[in-house]
Every structure is written in structure tokens, then in C-alpha cells.
Amino acid sequence: MAPLLGRRPFPLVKPLSEAATGEGEEEVYMIEHSKEAFRSREEYESRLERYAERIWTCKSTGSSQLTHKEAWDEEQEVAELLKEEFPVWYEKQVLEMVHHNTISLDKLVDQSWMEIMTKYADGEECDFEVGPEKYLRAKIVKVHPLEKEEQASEKKSEGSCDSPSSDKENSNKVAQDIQLKEESNRLESLSSLRESDRARRSPRKLPTSLKKEEKKWVPPKFLPHKYDVKLLNEDKVISFVPVDSLYRSERPPNKEILRYFIRHNALRIGTGENAPWVVEDELVKKYTLPSKFSDFLLDPHKYMTLNPSSATKRKSLGSPDQKPAKKSKKSPLSPSSWSLANLKKTAVNSSSSEEEMQLMIGANLNKKGSIGKKSDKKKPKNGKSQVLNGQKISAKTRSPKKGLKSPKLKQMTLLDMAKSTPKVSRAQKGGSNTPRSSSKPNKYLPPAALHLISYYRDNKNREDRKSALSALISKVARMLSAEDRKRLPDDLQELVQKRYELLEHRKQWAVMTEEQREEYMRKKREALKARIKEKTRERKQKEREERLEKQKRYEDQDLTGKSLPTFKLVDTPEGLPNALFGDVAMVIEFLSGYSDLLLPDGQYPVTAVSLMEALAAEKGGFMYLNRGLVVLLQTLLQDEIAEDYGELGMKLSEIPLTLHSASELVRLCLRKSDSPAGENESIEKGDEDSEGSAVYQDDEVEDEYLEKLETSEFFELTTEEKLHILAALCHRILMTYSVQDHVDAKQQRSGELWKERLAILKGENDKKRAAKQKRKEQGTVKPKEEVQAAKIVKKQEKINTQQDNDAEDMISAVKSRRLQAMQAKKEKEEHEKLTKERIERETEEERSRKQKASAEKAFHEGIAKAKLVLRRSPLGTDRNHNRYWLFSDEVPGLYIEKGWVHDSINYRFSPESKQDSEQDAEESEDANSSIGCPDDSTQREEKHAETTVPKQGQNLWFLCDTQKELDELLDSLHPQGFRESQLKERLQNRYQDIMHSIHLARKQNLGLKTCDGQQELLNFLRSDIIEVATRLQKGGLGYLDDTTEFEAKVRTFENLKDFGECIVFLQAAVIKKFLQGFMAPKQKKRKHQSEEAAAKAEEQDEEKKMAEEAKVASAVEKWKVAIRDAQTFSRMHVLLGMLDACIKWDMSSENARCKVCRKKGEDDKLILCDECNKAFHLFCLRPVLFNIPDGEWLCPACQPATARRSSRGRNYAEDSTQDEDEEEEEEESEEEEEEESDEEEEEQEMMGQRLRSRKAAKGKPGRPTRRGRPPKNNTHSRVSRQRYVEDTEADVEEMVRQSKPTSRRQNQEFQKCEEILAKLIKYRFSWPFREPFNADEIEDYTKVVTTPMDFQTMQSKCSCGSYQTVQEFLNDLKLVFGNTELYYEAGSSQLSCLEKTEQCARDLLGKHLPAHTYQRRHRKHQSPEPEPETANPGRGRKQKK
């Protein structure tokens, strides 16, 4: 085994024997891979040069243009593969077929593979079935031949092949029979596939084509041979075992392995099409392979001298006029030698009878169409037959004269006519076609040319006949003259003419000198360049024309192409028409696109399938539909456009929003104008606020739908009505300021991400440029470093030599050890330094990689979210103007919309003016967005190509939910259609997104949660009423002592009127002072005036008081009437929510917190003031109360001032004037009224019954006096009183401090102040302000700073409750920072900490106390005592950051 040189084996040099190599001391040269040994260096080098050339061919794989070593290694790899993959017992079976076979390699592989698959080999190990599911290991000992009938059929086919006059037709017939036999075996094997045939997988990777065949194709059926098998475990032989009882345990080799085996162990001798395969001699001897041909490899000239008659006979068969040729010497090689057949056996038995030979020859002549030609009937003299290129020729047909004798005529039978008629007609047709292209039809072409014509016609498309056809063309090109070449058929004439020119060129080349050859090659190269240039120009021109042609667009309906695939309708539940799927998709897309705004908590998304089921279900869809309504109403009611939405004098945003009140709130939001309560509000607010609710003509709901909602629940409406209301609600939300802000925020975020991305890219480019510049600089410095390194190395070598010379000296030894230790230490330090740098570099790279990945992820997410909030546009339209949609994951699949045009859409395809286009864009709901659309110029050019308009019709939706349908759609879209070209491009660009959506469409829907909507509303109404009653009773806000009977009574109610009476009863049971809103009694606190002034005021305000009471009574009466007239449970829920919102729940004892210690707990020791409802612990009061007093109890702040003065024996009114007292009393009353209004608003905002907090109103019209002038500070009154009474200063301060009650909002603000102070103390830059200054350490501090303050002191004041207002806390905070700025000089560390800490304080105050502003004047050496700063009342709405 060795690589081939070209197609021939190359002998290797034998390795020298050991004795020969041991005798002489001559140097031996050996090649490593082939182990060839040479004594001569010249031979060795010449052989190496030869082996290094790429002229070698691997014998096992056929790979050419390899070096000798590559081919050798490839052969070794194939040998190892065959050891693993090719069992030993198949070797003899395959090699017997290969040896001396003349067919091509592909056919040889197919035949040997079929032989292995249909027959067990001798020596093969298999499983022998001895019982049901019981097998024994056995070995094939003998293969019995088939039965007689099958043998006879085989002999018959072989005999026809062995005929000496067999021709192309016979060989084709044999090949067809074999092919039919293989196909029949394969078809039979499909039904008899055995389950027990276990496949042994190959360790090597097979081609993908074989893998695909294994999946689709079944191995052929075994032939019905019988076998003798020997059991491996026992020494027994069982004879005549049928093939059905044997099972192959190991998979036989595939065709690729067979191909490797045949190439590896056999070689094809010659290059002809019928060249034989010869197995290696070792394997021939090992398996005693029989030789099929005795004289197969004879020289052709010698063979022709022995068999001249064969050529004569073949020439006579090929003549067009069906006449025998006169002379055979004109053609030493017969044309029949080129029409060879693939035969299994070519040797003829010498004992064959004359009759058999005569019959076979006669049959072959009849098939050829030559009736009058028959070979001689006499037996050959020598009894042998000769072979030319694998074809049998009788030895008796030498004499041409005997072959020209006319045989006896016979009567033709019908069978003979049937066989000969098609062949004769074909021969006549071929003969008549030949002279058509000739200028002289009466003159015939030479026989070789005629044979070439027929051979070319039959074999021009066959790969295995190309070499024979090429040789025949060369022969005819040499033989024919120019005139004869012109008479050939056109296609053949061109081939012969080119071959003739090639042969003439070779002759001229042979007689040329070197100069002539160079000149000729130069001209030829120039001509070739010019031709290539011309061809390139023509090719570019053609490509340009093709490209321009492809860019042209035509009307889709004018083009002819594949028909579009038929899609199925979208599967909708019963009761939901297919035409409404578009509205369902619109609602789902809105919820999905604005999920960050509508569903900020990442709630479970609303899907199209579930929404359709909920719409189709009646009572079962209550939970799912109302959840969608709640999601939409949460955003709508908190927006500024819903500030004027009201009912019965209350804003809709203040009513609790639940699943049970959503239906009624939807009706109230979608009204064209608000109820009369809106008019009442407008009367209260004035002309400025009397606009009422906004009217939306574009997105309003029909009145009949809203009238139905008054008498029925939302889930009880029809499917179309529910969907129409959902769509209108989505359109209403699209007009809100929240949506506008959300879209702006997403677009702004997208722009910021683009800027960040560009900055990152710029930074990377800068780094690359810097690294490149650094490499250039290092490249210039490197040679100098190398010179220095070389000098150091030389010095080190000198030192080493000196050390070697003085090695005997002890001092030099010690020095060398020290030097070595120092050098080792230096190397270790250098190594550690390099390791540290490498670790730092790797860490930095990993950090930058993670940062880059996170930035890339954030960028793509931001861009995707920015696209989500824009209008969804279709992917495109097809030839029939059907639109194709790809929605979000909640609406999975590719959807096709048909009949989308209606009367309100003005579809145009001609150029139009700018104004018309803008008007159409406003009118059309389905106008395409600007994103993803082509340029205007291309649109104007392409608009001319569209000449059809979509037709109005029924709106239907279809679904493409399989990859096969999508591929068919892409294949059927025309690439030059105006609409379909764009659609195809977008579908291809988004192919992966569409496949992801199709995959999601296959997931099974979980279904809806079963519920009864009417029962749910009933149960929750009962529980809400009971909850309100219980809270009233526990909080002490009503006149309810025991609610047990009330609860039992409510649980039995089912009628709305009964529930209404319960709610009215609850309203009446609430203590009046704990009501607010439109139910609160309009009473003003009386001012402390003189008796005359009080009488006048009472007379003047009596009419106003009566009007206000009538007004309140009328509002409550309207509410009661609405309760009695309510027809739906959701309406009753809304009215109950109004009552809930009008109760001051923060006044409940459940939420009470001690005013002194501000702590809850110990309810048994907690007492409430009957005037201000503030809570106090008994042990927190001064003096302490040991028991809860009977009757009404007033806190110290609410007790009459005169009573307290008289009880303590103090008099403060003598020295004060009456005007000052009136001014102070008026100021206190105004502040109390303001606080009460603030408390009402705070209570409405802090309601715990809502799903989400409501947005506060922008302006508070009830506080004009507060905005008109700033409130007076309590310090003023305290100072004024100090001027008159100095000895009672402490009592006055305490009385004034307690005269102003602390509201719930202030309690919360004080808690926020404590949190802010705690965070400031923990802030790392606040160390200069945490503790008070030590006067001993810093002596001059008290001289500069008159009023010291620090965080620790502020914290103690907060814990003691010393701060009465947030402004006092802010003043102390400003004092801390002002003292630091006053004492320390510029540039000190304390001032730098001041800036950072003050900025931190500003951020915390803006976050936790946005209603209070922090402003401090930066002045040095000013009076540190702060003045109270009033909040700017006109600052308006806070801007967003």
C-alpha cells in the first residue's frame, strides 16, 4: 500500500536489512513516514523533493494534488477506519465481486452493498432465534444456493450477457433487470423491517446525506437463502436454517465505508471506461480469489490481430444503409469498440452449441434492425473467444468475406416484428436526420462519423462514457475533412471543430522554436486578457441590466406567478365574530405596548385568547374583564383630564376603584357630559372651573351602550358592546397627559441610549488609536532595548567565565552564590509583578466585558420599548391588498387581514398634493407610521406602479401558524410586485421574530378562572357593608354599639333596595363631626368677639347658614335618592364608596396615636379629646390622670383659656389691648380652618380602600386667604406678650404652643423629619455637624457663633416633641450650616463637607417633604438667628426631573 503517482502505483525503496547496516559505518538516510532507507544523500534528497510535490493521489480516498506524506497519512487513517467499521467476514464477499470487474466504482459499491444487505456472509456472527424472544449467538458456516427457479433465471440473464455478439442494448437490458430487481427488493423490505435489527453507530461522522437517508429509507429484504450455522457457546452445527430465523446483530458497513474498502484494497488498471479492477496480490492469495479473464490485459494491437472479424462485424452493424461493409482494413479499430456494455461475465464456455450461438447472434441482429446480416454458423476452430476492452468477439469471425454472406431468409413472426419495429424506425429516423445539415445530402459520411453521431446521441449525458466519447471525437476530428465536418449535426460539429483546432495547435506547437512559442504565448495572453476584459464588461452590463430589471416594480395583479397559500380563519370562541378580532388585537396591543405605564408591577399580562374567552363567556368573564377595566381606569382617573369627572359632587378619582365598582365608573367616565353634580361643582368653583367634563367626539360611546350599563353590568352586555367600550376606553387613555409623558420619556431614553452608545464606540476607537500609536512608539524603541539587552548578556557571560575560572576560590564561590540569590530574588519579583499585572489586566477586561454586555442589553431593551409605544403598522400587503400583521407575544402568530377598507378610508395610488395626503392621514385609522417606511421619493416613484385599489368587503382575519405555511408564502410572493416585494423583504428580515411568535401560538391556553359575576358582586357588597359598620363601631365614629345583629341581617339580603336601606342607615349612624366632603355639615368656628359684634355677626350669617345647610341636605338627599334608584350592584358599590370616602377614618381610635409621645399601643390607657379628637396617654398628660374621667373630656389645648387662667390665678388680659386680641384670635381661627381643609384632603388621599393612590388636585380653591398673605408666626404673639408680662413667659409659650392642634399630616411630616435627620447623621461627610462644639477646646467659637446648633441637639428636640412645625426643624438645619459657614474659612475641610451634606439634605427634603422648600442665604458674619421663611404659594406644579 502506497500513494499513487497520478493513477499508477509508485514502488517504494526497500528498507536496508540490519546486517547490511551493521557491516559498514556509512551514513544511512531514512524517510520517516515510509521508512525508506538510502545510502546516497542525493537519492534521498531527490526523493524528498519528489515527495514534497503535490502530484500524489491517495489510493484509499482518491484525493489528488497531495504531498506524499499527506496521502500516506490519509491512507493510514482510512486503514484505521476500516479496522473499526468494516467486519472481517465481509472482505471475501466484496473482494470476489471487485476482482477483475469492469464496471464503475459507484455501480460496484451499489452492487456490493446490495449483496451484503440481502445475504449473510460466510463467517458472519448473528443472532439465531430458537424460541419466542430467545436468541443464541451463532456463526454462518455455509450459504446454500437459491432454489432451481431462481438459479435458472440467473443463468438465463448470465447467458444473454455472455453472448459473443452482445451489444449495447443487451447490456442495458441486463442493467435494467438488475435495477428492477434491486427496486423490487427495496419495496418488499419496507413491509418486512425487523425491530430486532440493532444499528451499530459509526464512531466517525457520516455525511448528512446518509443521515437523511437513514431516516427515510428502509434496508432491503434478505434473499431466501438457507444457511448452516454453528453455535458459539456450543459445538453444534445446525443445517438449513431459514433466513427468517437469523437476525443481524451488527450494522453492516455503509456505502462510504464500502467505497473506502474497495479503493484501499484494489486498483483500477487503465483509464478506459471498462478498465478492470485488480485486487492486491496478498488478498488474492489469502482468499484464493478466482480470475475472471485469462487474456484480459493483452495489448490492443495484438488482440486485434487475433480477432479481426469482430471489428468487421461491428462495422457492418453500424452502417446507416444496413449494408455490409466491403473492406475491414480501412478501420483497424472498429467503431463498435466505443459502444461497450457493462457485463458481469465475459468468458464463454467452449462447449456451447452451434444453435445457441446462432439464436443469440440472430436475436442481436434483429434488435439492431439489420435483418439480412447473420454471422457464420460454423463452430470456431480454436474454440476460444477473444476480448477487446471487455467485449466478447468470436474467433471464427475473422474472415470478412464470410461475414458478408447473405444469410437465408426467414419468415418474420409477429414477435420479431414487435422487437424490430421500434429499433428500425429509430435507425431510419437517425439516418434521415444525419444528412440534414449536409450541403450534399447524396454523399454519405464515413462510418466512423456515423458511429460518432449515434454514440453521441445515446451517451452524451452519461458520465461514465465521457472518456470513450472524447476519444471517438478525437479520432473523427483527425479523419474528417473540413467539408465533412460541416455536414455533422450542429452540436456535434462544434465539438469536432474545437477538437480539430486543438490537434492542429498541438502540431504547430511541436514545430515551433522557443522564440516563436514565447511570442505566441504573449499574443495569446493579450488576446485572453482582452477577451476576459470584454467578457467582464459584458457580464457587468448584464448584471446591471438584471439588477435594474429586478428593481422595476409592477402592479402585482398584472404579474403571473405562484398562487398564494390558503390560510385558515382565526379560531374565535362561539359568540365572537371573526370580524371583531381586529378590535381584540388592538386592545391587547395597547395593554402590551404601554405595560410599563398600565401594569408597572409586572402583573400577569392580558392575552388575546383569554380576552376572547372572557368576552364570549357571560358570567364567567367577570373577573378577567373587570381586571382589564381596573387597569385602564387606574391610569385614566389619575390623569389631569379626569379632574373634572365627578358624580354627586365628588370627584371620580376619590371613589374607591375595585373590581366591583369598575363597571359603573366606566359608565361615568365615558359620558358625554357629567351629571348635574358637575354643575353643582361649577357653581362652587366659579366660572373658571365650570367647564365640566371634557367631550370627546372621536372616542365617545353610543348612548344606547351607556343606557344599558345603567341597568346591567358590564359582563352582561353583548360581545360587540363590551369590545366597543374597551376600545373607546383605550382611545380615551391615549389622549391623556400620562400617555404623552410616557411616550416622551421612552423617546428621550432612546436618544440617551444612542448617545451613550456613540460615546462608548468613540472611547473604544480612541483606545485603539492610542494602542496603535503606542505600538509604533515601542517599535522605534525596541532596537535600542535589544542592544542594551545584548550588552547585559555579554557582561553576564564574562562574569560567568570569571566565576568558572575562580571556582576553586572560596571567596568567588560565596560571591557567585550571593549573585545567584540576588538574581533569583530579582526574577521572583519580576515574575510576581508580571503575574499581578496580568491578573489586573484580566480583571479589567472581564469588568469591561460585563459592563459592555449590560450596556448592550440596556440599549436593545430601551430601543424596543421606544418602538412599542409607537403606532403598530402592518408588515405589508399582498397582490389582493390583504394586510399582514405581526403583533406582540400576547397575540402570537402571523395574521392576515382581508376586507379592511371601509367608507371612511380614502385609498389612493396616484400622486396627490400635500394637503390631501395630510387630510387622508388624519381620516385613516390605519395609516402607516413613519418608522420603517421607505423614503418619500421612492414612494412617489413607486406609486405609479400601483394601479388597483382594495375592494370593500367583509372583514376577515386569517392565521399563519406553521413554518411550512410561512415558507410557502415567501416562495409565492413575487419579487417584482409593487406590494409583494416590500412584504417579502420585511417577512425575510423578521423571519426569526415570526417563527418565535408562531412557536408561542402553539402553547396551550390555561383557560379562565371559573366564577359567577352576579354572585361575586352580591358577596362583596355584603362584605363591604359589614366592614364599614365594623370599622365605625370599633373606631368610635358612629352610634353603633353592637353589629352582630346588623351583620346577620345583611347576610340575608339579596335585593338592591334592602342593601340601599342598610347603606342609608349607616350614613345616619355616623357622628356628624366625623363626616367630610359633600356630607360634612358646613359650620364655622365662632370667633371670640364682643357681645355686640357677636350679635351682629349672628344676625348677618343666619341666612347664609340656612342656605348652606339646605345645600348639604340637598346633596345628601340626592345621594340617598341615587341609592334607592340604583339598578346594578356596581352602582351600589360606587355609592357605598362615596360614603366610605366621606368618613374621617383617621379620626378613628384604631389609628389613634398619642400626641405627646406619638406612639400607638396601650389602648386601655388612651383617651380621646371630645373636641379635637386628639389622643393622649393618661401617663403622658401633665398633670397625670390615673383614671378615665366620666362624661366629656377636653385636652389642655381645647379647654377654655379663661378657665385655665382663673384656675391658676393668672391674668393676662389686663395689659393687652382689645385690637391685638381680636387680631390673634382671627389669625388662629384662620389657621385652624386651613388645617381642617388640609386634613380633609389628606384623609381622601390616604384612603386604604383603593387599589392605587389617587392623584391630588392641582389647585386648592378653598384657600384664597392663605395665598393672599403669609401667616403670622407664633413667635410674634409670644414676643408681644413678653413685653407686658415677663414673669409668666413660660406659661404663655406653652399655651400658645398647645393652642394649635397638630394634624395627622404634621405627624407624618415630623416622622419624615426624624428619618431625614437620622440619614444625615449616618452620612459620611456630616462629621463636623454631629456633636456640639467643646467650648474648652475651641475658645473663640462662642464669640463668633452666638447660637450653636448641631444634629445631636436637633435629634433630642425631635424626640422630646419640641418642634411644632416643619419650618422650625428647617430653621435649625439652616442654623447648623450657617454657623459652620460663619466660623470656618474658605478652603477648609469643614466647608467642603458642608457643601456635600447640604446637598444631601436638599435631596432628602425634596424626596420626602416636597411641599416644603429649603433655601438658605450664603452670608458670612451675619446674625445667626433665622427668620421663618414662608413657602412660595405661587410656585405651581413641580417640574419633573
From Swiss-Prot:
Basic residues bias (residue ranges): 398-408, 1251-1270
Tissue-level expression: Highly expressed in the neural tube.
Annotated GO MF terms: ATP binding; histone binding; histone H2AXY142 kinase activity; histone kinase activity; non-membrane spanning protein tyrosine kinase activity; zinc ion binding
Enzyme Commission designation: 2.7.10.2
Biased composition annotated in UniProt, kind: Polar residues: 386-397, 430-441, 1299-1308
Catalytic reaction(s) noted: L-tyrosyl-[protein] + ATP = O-phospho-L-tyrosyl-[protein] + ADP + H(+)
InterPro entries given in the database record: BAZ1B, BAZ1B_Bromo, BAZ1B_PHD, Bromodomain, Bromodomain-like_sf, DDT_dom, WHIM1_dom, WHIM2_dom
Location(s) in or outside the cell: Nucleus
UniProt-listed Pfam families: Bromodomain, PHD, WAC_Acf1_DNA_bd, WHIM1, WSD
Regions of compositional bias (Basic and acidic residues) in chain numbering: 147-171, 776-785, 824-858, 937-946
Record-linked PROSITE patterns: BROMODOMAIN_2, DDT, WAC, ZF_PHD_1, ZF_PHD_2
Acidic residues bias: start-end ranges: 686-696, 1216-1245
Coiled-coil region: 513-558, 813-861, 1080-1113, 1213-1253
Region called Disordered, residue ranges: 147-212, 307-338, 364-445, 531-555, 675-696, 766-785, 823-858, 911-949, 1204-1308, 1408-1441
Protein keywords: ATP-binding, Bromodomain, Coiled coil, DNA damage, Kinase, Metal-binding, Nucleotide-binding, Nucleus, Transcription, Transcription regulation, Transferase, Tyrosine-protein kinase, Zinc, Zinc-finger
Main location: nucleus
Known cofactor(s): Mn(2+)
Annotated GO CC locations: nucleus; WICH complex
Stretches assigned to the Bromo domain: 1304-1408
Zinc finger (PHD-type) residue numbers: 1151-1201
Membership in a protein family: Belongs to the WAL family. BAZ1B subfamily.
Domain notes: The bromo domain mediates the specific interaction with acetylated histones.
Record note on quaternary structure: Interacts with smarca5/snf2h; the interaction is direct and forms the WICH complex. Component of the B-WICH complex.
Function: Atypical tyrosine-protein kinase that plays a central role in chromatin remodeling and acts as a transcription regulator. Involved in DNA damage response by phosphorylating 'Tyr-142' of histone H2AX (H2AXY142ph). H2AXY142ph plays a central role in DNA repair and acts as a mark that distinguishes between apoptotic and repair responses to genotoxic stress. Essential component of the WICH complex, a chromatin remodeling complex that mobilizes nucleosomes and reconfigures irregular chromatin to a regular nucleosomal array structure.
Name the record gives this protein: Tyrosine-protein kinase BAZ1B
Source organism of this protein record: Xenopus laevis
Lineage of producing organism: Eukaryota, Metazoa, Chordata, Craniata, Vertebrata
The gene coding this protein: baz1b
